[in-house]
């Protein structure tokens, strides 16, 4: 099989290329049955194009960086991110990652061979390879030079469990958003300067609802919609029985008050009554409420303003007022939004526009930080600046909460042996509940209830994310949004709805790409920066080598580590690049010199692992340092075809498209199949925990590779979800392969007995009986239609056409009706016609089915030509794809039969 694969390259040398890109799997996890599905689709079209006369290079790849690897190593070593650099050095940790990431290579290789997937495993691209990384650096420098790379302090999705920020495409992986039941509260924000009618009955409050009560201590504003109608309502607090006047959106009045109680005498209410009377005493537009002030709801910490130099001053007098926001709706809540600028992008935006300060803590280093640390818990007092604590923290109130986890998922006690015990965590009291109970006791809660809402989770830890302020590097992908949309319209998506829907809508709502990852094992961001803000983006190892020489001359470095290791700039051999390591911690030790003579340190971040895989069209070739011509002249770029699961729509498919658009103003692929999920026979997602996962090795062992492949391709279109049922595989084995094999077994003994070796000239069509002319007409119609289906990336239609021809036309009609012609004595012209007709049908079917069922097709074809010598190839996969003979097609005859 390997020799044949190699021959398929050498024999097609000089032929037109069909360019295929292999999406890199990660070898730190075992392959699953869904990989058989995806690889069968890829293999089918690459084999088909080879038979059509194209040179199809298929370079394998390994995705070796990123969170999946790091979290697996942390679990294996029994450590957390905080231990790296303390109990284990970064060098030791990364060495463990490098080793771990390839641990299942043997199993992947084994599956590749057993399922008959042709891909060049001897010369794979590996994303941790220094030459691969160098191309990534070159691409980043192109983005940097186009002003498409920038640094920003913004609110981003952040995974405390993984210890890093996440990009929007990571957050939109399937299953990341899920329904959760949380404790929610409608808080009472006591007014400082109420309107007169708001003071006539009890204490006046604004009502604001939140699904994250733990963010209430960080509240610094309330936001109203400018055109929304609001009402002032006289009533009682249902928990404390205290008189109050509350303000909320008019359309939501009856969501919080029982309509039956409207107009009941306020004076008649007694605590405990089911109906709490209420009376509307005022109506306002949102604009009428702007500027009204309220008391800080949970006054643990006073807000501060921080200037560019890190100096801070208390700023409570600028906070705690009502501001405007166009995004406020009356779909749920109270129509008044609680604003915590440190924990929400919209919150930060409207607060900044209105001059509202954020609620920052100042740590020991003098740095502003949100109230929650990077592990997901409230800061400890002894981690904070003493002056800040003295002037801005109510220690008596806050100390009870210091160190508390804002979500139980982040608490290490609920993670045992690296596995999160979600059930136990859900049953324990949460910080949200604790805060709500405290608010209830102090008359600050209007309503507390459980609420099911859709909340994002980390794609690798399965734990909730926070929206958190981080200093990160971004790719300005929004600048290329219109061009990405335009180029996407030129791509042939299968199905089309994925391109216009899931992918197209994603592009229309594009955000800038958060590139930074605060981790250790990955591609280092090649940007060096001085404290004064001077920057240098490095685009090659040679450039870095030369900049180190400048740094040595300036006295910031004593030696060039690359020179010491014998690295020769400009020599692109594997041996030369293996002398160095571009990963952390070694790259962090390099100090460069700015144009003004200041020291520059590397920005500590790694880059998003999805950039690694999205750059593979260029990095697999070490472009532009090598193979520049085949990319620039478009002979090996863009891809004619790629295929992966639908989950890659906002992953690999997007990053390929984004990088290609922004750097090359091109598509990265012309045709793409996004295959559906492989579910169990009942339509449930497969998982080891549920015991319904299918082992691909066991399935191939039990049923064979070809029946498995044929079943997956013909059962449903690749882009539909496949309900995997072993009964279906067995049916394919029996009905299709069994029927075809029985047809060959019928033919071969009679042909051998009569000495048929196809040495005679073809019996003219005019001398053949009608049934021969009919089956050959059907055969050539089949060739034409199957060829069209393969060419249109419709493998299911192709497979079903072949299936129907074999079962119905060939076996059920032709062989059944012609048996006596083969049984007859003598070697008549009629018998020869029957042999020639059936032989051509079998030989052609072997070629047509070869892309989907490579093993059986090859066996059948080689058995046939071994006797006749009609073809001199080492495999059916080196044969030419059948060509339809239009002169043989007789549609009238086909219809009549």
Positions of the model-derived regions?
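N-terminal, positively charged nucleic-acid-binding surface of large information/translation enzymes
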Residues: 1-241, 340-345, 350-353, 360-376, ...
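Conserved oxyanion/phosphate-binding beta-strand-loop segments in alpha/beta enzyme cores
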Residues: 1-21, 67, 74-78, 95-111, ...
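Acidic, turn-prone loop/beta-hairpin segments
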Residues: 63, 156, 166-178, 529, ...
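Core structural elements
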Residues: 111-113, 135, 513, 713-715, ...
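Gly/Pro-rich turn-and-neighbor structural signature
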Residues: 122, 129-177, 182, 188-194, ...
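Catalytic alpha/beta core of large soluble enzyme barrels
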Residues: 228, 232, 236-365, 377, ...
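Conserved phosphate-binding loops in nucleotide/dinucleotide-binding enzymes
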Residues: 339-342, 598-609, 628-633, 640-644, ...
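Catalytic adenosine-cofactor/nucleotide-binding cores of aminoacyl-tRNA synthetases and other
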Residues: 366, 457-461, 645, 677-682, ...
